[in-house]
């Protein structure tokens, strides 16, 4: 194991995202936003969980960085694998870094009414 990252977030913080499209587009890709629309009643929990996942990955990668890289949270996309579990799809400089370092990323997300939490493990 190389590194870990964890983030917990109050789900309530993301209610404003539903009313503010620009705010949502600042942190989430178009693909993620489309997937949220399919969620139905659990959109806010899903938003919070995916945001926590992105923050967890940053926390896990930061100790491994040997140089500064430019990224936005939109460069970290949280998608579903064929098995149905959440996984990362990275873009731009953060993707290049992960490839260069030969990193394997493991992600778990959980949410329960008030809170969402994500845990990331990084290995190579």
From Swiss-Prot:
Binding site for Mg(2+): 7, 55
Main location: cytoplasm
Localization in the cell: Cytoplasm
Entry superkingdom: Bacteria
UniProtKB keywords: Cytoplasm, Fatty acid biosynthesis, Fatty acid metabolism, Lipid biosynthesis, Lipid metabolism, Magnesium, Metal-binding, Transferase
UniProt cross-references to InterPro entries, sorted A to Z: 4-PPantetheinyl_Trfase_dom, 4-PPantetheinyl_Trfase_dom_sf, ACPS, Ppantetheine-prot_Trfase_dom
GO terms for cellular component: cytoplasm
The enzyme's E.C. designation: 2.7.8.7
Pfam families named among the record's database cross-references: ACPS
Reaction(s) catalysed (UniProt annotation): apo-[ACP] + CoA = holo-[ACP] + adenosine 3',5'-bisphosphate + H(+)
Molecular function (Gene Ontology), one example: holo-[acyl-carrier-protein] synthase activity
The protein's required cofactors: Mg(2+)
Gene3D superfamilies given in the database record: 4'-phosphopantetheinyl transferase domain
GO biological process entries: fatty acid biosynthetic process
Family recorded in the similarity comment: Belongs to the P-Pant transferase superfamily. AcpS family.
Function: Transfers the 4'-phosphopantetheine moiety from coenzyme A to a Ser of acyl-carrier-protein.
Listed name of the protein: Holo-[acyl-carrier-protein] synthase
Organism: Borreliella afzelii (strain PKo) (Borrelia afzelii)
Gene designation per UniProt: acpS
């Amino acid at each position: 194991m190389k590194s870990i990252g964890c983030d917990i977030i109050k789900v309530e913080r993301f209610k404003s995202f539903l009313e503010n499209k620009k705010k949502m587009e600042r942190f989430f890709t178009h693909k993620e936003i489309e997937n949220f629309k399919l969620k139905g009643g659990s959109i806010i929990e899903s938003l919070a969980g995916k945001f926590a996942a992105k923050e967890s990955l940053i926390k896990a990668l930061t100790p491994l960085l040997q140089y500064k890289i430019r990224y936005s949270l939109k460069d970290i996309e949280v998608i579903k694998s064929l098995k149905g579990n959440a996984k990362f799809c990275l873009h731009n400089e953060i993707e290049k870094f992960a490839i260069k370092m030969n990193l394997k990323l493991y992600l778990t997300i959980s949410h329960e009414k008030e809170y969402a939490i994500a845990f990331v493990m990084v290995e190579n």
